[in-house]
Amino acid sequence: MASDYDHRKIEAKWQREWAKKKVYKTIDSGDKPKFYVLDMFPYPSGEGLHVGHPKGYIATDIISRQKRMQGHNVLHPMGFDAFGLPAENYAIKMKTNPRIAVAENVARYKKQLEILGFDYDWSREVNTTDPKYYRWTQWIFLKLLEKGLAYESYEPINWCPSCKTGLANEDVEDGRCERCSTPVEKKPMRQWVLKITDYADRLLADLDMLDWPAHIKESQRNWIGRSEGAELAFPIKGRKDVLTVFTTRPDTLFGVTYLVVAPEHAFVTELLKKKENLANHAEVVKYVAHARMMTQIERTDAKKDKTGVALEGVMAINPANGEEVPVFVADYVLADYGTGAVMAVPAHDERDFAFAQNYKLPIRTVIEPLFIKLGGNDGVKEGQPFVDRNAVACIVKHWEEDKYLVSKWKTNDWQGFVMGGIEGNENEGDAATREVAEESGYLSAQYKRTLGTVHSKFHHDVKSVNRFAHFKVAYLELKDGKQGPVSEEEKRLQEISWVDGKKVKDFVNRPDVRQMWDFFAQGQMYAGEGILIDSGRFTGTESEVVKKKITESVGGKWVVRYKLKDWVFSRQRYWGEPFPILHDGDKIVPVAEKDLPVVLPPVKSYEPSGTGESPLATIDKWVNVKVGRGKDAKTLKRETNTMPQWAGSSWYYLRYMDPANGKALVDAKKEKYWNQVDFYVGGAEHATRHLIYARFWHKFLYDIGVVSTTEPFKKLQSVGLIMGEDGRKMSKRFGNVVNPDEIVATYGADTMRVYEMFMGPFDQAINWNTDSMIGSRR
């Protein structure tokens, strides 16, 4: 490259030329195939762009230009997500009105984006704070209300004491506010809520049709968290109360040895009203008060010891067998998860097992593991019957060292323990000592105990039969190393050796044998599927096939539940879309569509009140709306909560198709032409918020005929963060922010664009290094 190349002069010239000739202005029809490429639009923070922000924008610009050159009609717009907490918190910090702060920040962002030379059609710019835009956000809310998908709730919600507002579950990370990291509290408050759970199954099923990164789709599946299970009722002895539990494992019902309820459960609240209800009333009051002061993350910390207090004098009745079981209150159970009460089966649940050990509660095994080997020499052979066999598996300890006897078969790749059949009238102890002597020659094995039973279906290649073996897992110890002879047949079949205790689990290579070792190393807890024992008429059946039958037998209900909760859609802040709602006492009155938008009014004090009311509640002239005439005249009150920052971003991609339309959210012909976003680029951190919310709203708009597709974004590409040179996230707080304006001034926009695209894998985080710009500049 010539040393006199003046990037400032050349880049400025062509940017002026593109703007003057409106090179990137997009038409809404034509013979060319269409291509819609989109960035997740930014919220305009006061700090402006740093070099990490344009990474995705550069990628979409490259795709856009490529598609133009390939003959496509390309829509590549840009706008600003300017409502919500980020913009409002910045305005409060700077003691500037949010309107003024946002206008200044948007102007700065546009200037920064323009000098990078992107091919945006700025004539289609949208801004979520523009009344002409949020008129249609309000219109969508009215349609949701009309269809019964928006409702008021007074349930306890997530409350951030620092931001002084309610939060959706998606705005909480590990029990803390996503914006400020303050521990979140639970606070009962009137809220508007959207019934996103009505769309849960569709949100799950349609993920399969999307060309999205696998980890993003998996994040959404986990967040939606669909599970099928049973609601079972446990009557309380001597009372009219019934505790209803939700469980995905009704097959373990006969193994219940206690119940646990959340400290906030209505049953606990009712019991505490009278001292005589509980023998340990004072102890329970103290425990409940302490639990309610803890954050959710503290209560559910897997590393924390499980604590609880028995509700002394309260016994629940197991509907399966009529047994009386104690009831505990424990902080690890959450009132808003499931029913707020759980049946505890310590033999088949790790958390219940730990709690039962702490409080010396009974542990009753009702499921024995069942494993089926498929594939390989020892895989079950189709068409062959199974031959049942009672057998023993021997875990044998060395007489001096922490080593255990293992077997490696020579006819296939099986590795495990000494095993064999139980003959005639033998018990497992006799069979175990005999098998150890026959297969290893060791003569001093002493049977100590049986650890459990493991059932296994496999092909016994030596016997040439499909075997259904019922292994008693026996633990033995050798007194010494004395050995007798081992038959040549045994030597031909297997190799016997010793393995250090820490390496046994790595040595054994079949799931059923690993479970045998787990019985020894970890205790009798088993959380998998298997064969029922001690379960009345269901004994001997496979657990997976009997779940619904057991549920029906005790009058329970088979239900579908979701981890996903309905979307808390209110914020007790100023800077958001006003709700198009009036209140006539307890009656909700929607604002007429012809009166939209309900414009956000100026306010003297826009800082959050912390009282549960937004600053809008102080504007009497705006809040009080007179309707009717004469004797029919009355005053209604406006809704003073505002919508969350996610409202405007849940449909903005549609407005780019038709940004100036004053009669409809989007013209039907234009929507059908542009169809889905073909290529969408943005951060993976939006997987369980924006991307779920936008999919929900899009499906709703499809249902009411506004859009012609069931999904908004056909292909998604996630962007890896560009970190500071020190390896930390770029932040003014760390002093590691790199300003793109300075990079462009020194090296040029093209240099920066090339550098960011070749830093490393696009979807992975990588550290910035200004010195590396030199190669791209050349």
Specify the residue positions occupied by each region the protein language model found:
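Amphipathic alpha-helical
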Residues: I10, Q15, I196-S227, A262, ...
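Conserved oxyanion/phosphate-binding beta-strand-loop segments in alpha/beta enzyme cores
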Residues: M1-L38, R68-P77, A101-R108, W212, ...
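Residue patterns forming the tRNA-binding/recognition surfaces of aminoacyl-tRNA synthetases
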Residues: D4, K13, E17-K21, K93-L243, ...
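Unchanged
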Residues: I422-Q515, F519-S535, G540
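N-terminal strand-loop-strand
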Residues: L370-V418
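Conserved active-site neighborhood of enzyme catalytic/cofactor-binding cores
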Residues: P44-L75, R176-E178, A279, G338, ...
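N-terminal catalytic cores of NTP/NDP-binding nucleotidyl/phosphoryl-transfer enzymes
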Residues: I27-P98, V102, E125-I140, C163, ...
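Catalytic alpha/beta core of large soluble enzyme barrels
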Residues: T60, N73, H265-P369
